[in-house]
Every structure is written in structure tokens, then in C-alpha cells.
Amino acid sequence: MIQQQQQFDCVELDELYWFIERKNTEKACKNIYVITMVSRQPRQILGFDVAFDKTSERIQKIINDAAEAEKYCTDGYYGYLGVIYTGKHIYNIHNKKDSFTVEGVNADLRHYIPTLARRSRCFARKLENLRAAISVFVHAYNKFGLAKYHYRLTHKKKEVPFSIIDFI
């Protein structure tokens, strides 16, 4: 993971699930989970894990491996309870207003990685292959996100939009 800062203001956690080999319509027995941890400013993926389960221990490892944040925002999944530092957890079970950034990153993951697209015929054959694809995506996403963040800090005018040309 690329981490440029020591501490972040707000970090969001969420998970998405998908399948290995094929989509089982009767019972999703080979679900895999992609757990992501994203900072709001600058928008970076601070940690992720790809696994067959989404246990509290797995979530705790992602949190421990990243820099500490002022507050942590999550959705209604019970696995987040008790793993985040006391007094720093915003647990919103009713809506996604506190986890909009990580939901957007998960949408980007589904958009840019064909094996995570909802109506796709592409499926990862191995967990390691999906983990490697997400790792490459995270590296490029963080690099582009930091370039965009620094560009916006130096160019305050709204007439000067950030583009891929500025990144290259």
C-alpha cells in the first residue's frame, strides 16, 4: 500500500463480495470478500484484503497495518464492532452517508477490474489472482489519486481541471 501521511482525518471501511470460479445460483458457497480501507483526503486505499471470510481478526489486521486515523466510519456490518479504536468509530447502520468514499472506491473496483463486475462472465480462478489484480489496481489508483490531490492544492482555480494529461 502507498501511504504518504502518518495520520489521516477520516478513514472508511467496507466490504464487497464476489465469487471464485463461477457464480453459484443455488447457494453462494465460494464467496470471497474484498475488505477495503480508504481515506477521504487524500483519497487513497490504505489497506485491503481478499479472503473467503470477513472476520473481525482480518479487519483488525487491516486497521493495524495502516496509519492511525482520527475517526473510522463503517456501515452496519457487526464485524467492525470492537476492532476499531474506542471513541473513534462512527457506526452508521441506517444509511451510507458516512461511508460514501469507500462505496465509491468499491464501485471503481467493480468498474475497472472485470472479474468484479456484477453482470460479468469473468471469474477469478484463484484467490491469489484476484488479490494480485487488486494490488496492481491499488498501486495505480493511489498514485493517480495523490497526483490529483497535489494538483488541486497547487491549482486553486476551478477553470483548470485535472486530467490524465497532467498525470502523465
Residue ranges and their predicted role:
Residues 1-168:
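Residue-level recognition of single "structural anchor" positions
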